[in-house]
């Protein structure tokens, strides 16, 4: 491998000749050989959006030449397009402010910008700190990139995935609205409802968590840029934060604003905790939905078997003919990961000592992992399971007819204690509910048939 010599305030260091990064990135690469978790490319691209916006703002403020600004913008656009992904090698486990990743972006943009200028015959030189990082600090750029990346992940991936599954469940609510099944509480038989009603509960969960996520996401549209080192805005123009936020809004199509209090923006990540909490609420609901699906599909002969799920692959390497609820299992594992990520984010966000939180990279990594896992898992569950759910009406009807909990309909007519005696007698003697009721002498067959009708038990009545 061929190398070139780069220099920084610590001296000289060898850098691979074919890479666009420079000394500080190389030092980080050598000093932090920890794990395999690379800084998410979403953060890199959010940084590129920020650097592009900063260059244009500094140009408008008369602090950066048009020639340099144009080269920085072109280089940043290439990063956003994914052209230089392999030039961002740093892991998450670095300085807690994300300084090395900020400098990685600065160095790549500077070196690529200089290539662009050289191709045009210019002898102007772009400096990673003086030009690309002008009016900025890692302390305000990383939280800005964090918020931009998280907002885009939620609005471009998570929310559309929820909408997709919501639409599928809405179709199932209508398709199954006529199928009366036995309800279950505490994993025990309860009073009847329709399969459509049961699934409508799942649909409502997604409606609510979708709104929670969208609402919480608005708080992350406040950006730290303009706060520089400790929130005072030293070395930045007073209008810089607002101007950059406007540029970012224009490029992303999302309405970002300059955070009104930069001291808060640098040291606290409560907005990320709040939004990830909404993602955790979604995850909790998805766990419930996935579990209901796999339990309702259990069997086929020794389980509940009330719904049929698609057979996507052989279920067992030793037992032929099994159809396992693999999509539910994958989704519930994602939920477990999201729950763990939430604990990490909550603790990391509590570590804002004095003017700066120094757990930023791990917050970014875990939030973006949660967002993308949830989005991917929801789409997979929808496409490979939910759309293909069918009802086994024969088993559902059999379970309703066998249930002793239909006795609940007798409560207003013969009282709770008498109804309980009938249910216990039927269970003990192996009788149907009707047989036990008639033996009690409290009801005629005509009265029983009129009262104990599952169709009359699925909604309130006057």
Swiss-Prot record:
Short name of any one Pfam family annotated for the protein: Lyase_1
Active site residues of this protein: 186 (proton donor/acceptor), 316
Reactions catalysed: (S)-malate = fumarate + H2O
Keywords of the record: Cytoplasm, Lyase, Tricarboxylic acid cycle
Entry binding sites for substrate: 97-99, 127-130, 137-139, 185, 317, 322-324
GO biological process: fumarate metabolic process; malate metabolic process; tricarboxylic acid cycle
EC number(s) stated in the UniProt entry for this protein: 4.2.1.2
InterPro entries, per the entry: Fum_hydII, Fumarase/histidase_N, Fumarase_C_C, Fumarate_lyase_CS, Fumarate_lyase_fam, Fumarate_lyase_N, L-Aspartase-like
Site for Important for catalytic activity, residues: 329
This protein's pathway: Carbohydrate metabolism; tricarboxylic acid cycle; (S)-malate from fumarate: step 1/1
GO molecular function, one term: fumarate hydratase activity
Enzyme class: lyase
GO CC annotation terms, alphabetical: cytoplasm
Family statement drawn from the similarity comment of this UniProt entry: Belongs to the class-II fumarase/aspartase family. Fumarase subfamily.
Additional comment: There are 2 substrate-binding sites: the catalytic A site, and the non-catalytic B site that may play a role in the transfer of substrate or product between the active site and the solvent. Alternatively, the B site may bind allosteric effectors.
Assembly, per entry: Homotetramer.
Name of the protein described by the UniProt record: Fumarate hydratase class II
Organism: Bacillus anthracis
Encoding gene, per UniProt annotation: fumC
């Amino acid at each position: 491998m061929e190398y070139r010599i780069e220099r920084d305030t610590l001296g000289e260091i060898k850098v691979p000749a074919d890479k666009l990064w420079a000394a500080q990135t190389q030092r980080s690469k050598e000093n932090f050989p920890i794990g395999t978790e690379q800084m998410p490319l979403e953060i890199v691209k959010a940084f590129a959006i920020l650097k592009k916006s900063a260059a244009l703002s500094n140009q408008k403020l008369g602090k950066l030449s048009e020639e340099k600004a144009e080269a920085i913008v072109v280089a940043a656009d290439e990063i956003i397009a994914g052209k230089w992904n392999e030039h961002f090698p740093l892991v998450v486990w670095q300085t807690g402010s994300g300084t090395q990743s900020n400098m990685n972006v600065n160095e790549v943009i500077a070196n690529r910008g200089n290539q662009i200028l050289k191709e045009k015959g210019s002898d102007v030189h772009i400096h990673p700190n003086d030009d690309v990082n002008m009016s900025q600090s890692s302390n305000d750029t990383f939280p800005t990139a964090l918020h931009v990346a998280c907002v885009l992940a939620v609005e471009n991936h998570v929310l559309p995935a929820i909408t997709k599954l919501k639409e599928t469940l809405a179709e199932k609510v209508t398709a199954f609205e006529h199928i009366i099944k036995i309800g279950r509480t505490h994993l025990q038989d309860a009073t009847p409802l329709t399969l459509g009603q049961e699934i409508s509960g799942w649909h409502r969960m997604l409606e609510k968590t979708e709104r929670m996520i969208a609402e919480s996401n608005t708080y992350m549209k406040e950006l730290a840029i303009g706060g520089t080192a400790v929130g005072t805005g030293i070395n930045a123009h007073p209008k810089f934060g607002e101007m950059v936020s406007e540029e970012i809004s224009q490029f992303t199509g999302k309405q970002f604003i300059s955070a009104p209090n930069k001291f808060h923006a640098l040291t606290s990540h409560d907005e990320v905790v709040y939004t990830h909490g909404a993602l955790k609420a979604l995850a909790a609901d998805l766990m419930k939905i996935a579990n209901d699906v796999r339990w309702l599909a259990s069997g086929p002969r020794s389980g509940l078997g009330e719904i049929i799920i698609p057979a996507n692959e052989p279920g067992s390497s030793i037992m032929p003919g099994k159809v396992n609820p693999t999509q539910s299992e994958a989704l519930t594992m994602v939920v477990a990961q999201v729950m763990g990520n939430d604990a990490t984010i909550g603790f990391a966000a509590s570590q804002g000592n004095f003017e700066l939180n120094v757990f930023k990279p791990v917050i970014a990594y875990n939030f973006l992992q949660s967002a993308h896992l949830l989005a991917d898992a929801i789409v997979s569950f929808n496409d490979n399971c939910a759309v293909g759910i069918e009802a086994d009406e024969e088993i559902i009807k059999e379970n309703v007819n066998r249930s002793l909990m239909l006795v609940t309909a007798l409560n207003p007519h013969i009282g709770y204690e008498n109804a309980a005696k009938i249910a216990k007698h039927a269970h003990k003697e192996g009788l149907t509910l009707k047989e036990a009721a008639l033996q009690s002498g409290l009801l005629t067959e005509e009265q029983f048939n009129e009262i104990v009708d599952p169709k009359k038990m699925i909604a309130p009545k006057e």
